[in-house]
Amino acid sequence: MKIKGKIRGLVLTTLKEYIIAKKGKEGVKKVEKKIKEINHSFSFEGISSVRWYPANIIHLVMLLVLEVFGWSEEKNFEIGYEVPINSIIAKLMLRAFVSLPVAFKTTPRFWRNYTDLGEMNWVKTDIQKREAVLRLTDYPKVHLAIYEYFRGYLKKIMETMIKSKNLRVEITKSIYKGDEFTEFTFAW
């Protein structure tokens, strides 16, 4: 399926860093070799974190990484969770979120800084009850592993905001499973 849209190269640069940390530079070469086997000319070399890249290439690379190393969909959760730790852009974003209400208000704008696909908005934010629901609409139906990446990324960002490791994030609705949209439910 061809996905129309763009995503910042940050996803690829942090994925490359993750592969190097877990599998060394040889791991990156294995992924690039697999990509060439399917007749694609992608290379991690020269990828810029701030440039826009076709979303279908980024999704393809993320899925091929799982295949090359025999990793499960849940591994993408771990990758997404570790990305904000290594990303200067994510660290700057976290500094801009001075409180949960500000984070809730500015999430849609930050989503736009990363991709032109879909819309991300909070549909429930109850700080007293310690729960929130984030909805992703108009995002293409892609492999569940991509949503696991989002879940990991969102968990790490939210943990940093609430300064708690007791946070749970679940995908409670998923376009991948036939729902109209994807929702991430947070409880802490």
Which functions belong to the PLM regions below?
Residues 1-89:
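N-terminal low-complexity or simple alpha-helical regulatory segments
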Residues 49-149, 166-167, 173:
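Amphipathic interaction/junction segments at domain boundaries or subunit interfaces
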Residues 167-188:
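Beta-rich nucleic-acid/ligand-interaction surfaces
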